[in-house]
Design a protein with these regions (language model features):
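Intrinsically disordered, low-complexity terminal regulatory regions
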Residues: 13, 18-28, 34, 206-214, ...
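Bateman/CBS regulatory modules and CBS-like beta-alpha motifs in cytosolic regions of diverse proteins
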Residues: 1-26, 37-39, 43-46, 57-86, ...
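Short acidic/polar active-site loop segments enriched in Thr and Asp
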Residues: 33, 93, 154
Length: 221
């Protein structure tokens, strides 16, 4: 899934002679805190409401403001992971997309990113989620997949989180099997720590509920 497939057709663009008041009005209407600024088809940067509030005068044209450009966009062939990385690192509600000739192609809304994460992580597919913990030096994706497949299941998605101030990693797996008991038993035999599990049809435990709450807070930024 690449950036060009995530483009929204509702994100307005700003011109340098638009006023801060006009820009804030568009942001309020579309419930975003950033909008791209163009000079013709040339991308000039990404304007935020914080920049305008700090400037003070909402009647001035946005061309008078210092609008950041670096690390505020992705290219149209960028993978969704790169889009997420830019949005997360800069806390963006909108991610502009350019082609390799630096021509503006459109923008991606944060809500569009989140709506596509379920496809990336196979959230809608039936199965179980297993959260493992293991030493970094012992982590092997091949071994993890082998354990799952030994129990006649398949890994649908996998992501790894390096735990801060620790020599361990957390591995979150989505497998295509609801009855994950045998898989858990095998992981335990291989000395993996089972931190969490979730199976379709079961209620989320407290930790999973907290993580879901954090995701919702991120959506509302």
């Amino acid at each position: 899934m690449i950036a060009s497939s995530l483009l929204s057709n509702v994100v307005p663009v700003l011109k340098k002679d638009d006023t801060c008041a006009q820009a804030l009005g568009w942001m309020d209407l579309f419930r975003v805190s950033h909008l791209p600024v163009l000079d013709g088809e040339t991308y000039m940067g990404l304007l935020s409401d914080e920049i305008m509030y700090a400037h003070g005068s909402i009647h001035d044209p946005i061309g008078r403001l210092d609008i950041p450009r670096e690390m505020t966009f992705v290219y149209e062939d960028a993978h969704m992971y790169d889009v997420i990385g830019v949005a997360s690192s800069r806390l963006l509600s909108v991610v502009p997309v350019l082609n390799r000739k630096e021509v503006y192609q459109g923008a991606i809304l944060l809500t569009d990113i989140l709506h596509n994460i379920d496809k990336l992580l196979c959230i809608d597919d039936p199965g179980g989620i297993i959260v493992l913990e293991v030493n970094k030096i012992d982590y092997s994706l091949a071994e993890v997949a082998q354990i799952v497949e030994y129990n006649e299941a398949k890994v649908l998605s996998c992501y790894v989180t390096c735990m801060p101030d620790s020599n361990k990693v957390e591995i979150t797996l989505k497998v295509n099997m609801v009855g994950i008991g045998p898989i858990l038993d095998t992981f335990i035999r291989y000395r993996y720590v089972i931190k969490n599990t979730f199976v379709s049809g079961e209620e989320m435990n407290e930790e999973m509920r907290d993580r879901y709450g954090q995701l919702l807070k991120f959506m509302e930024m």
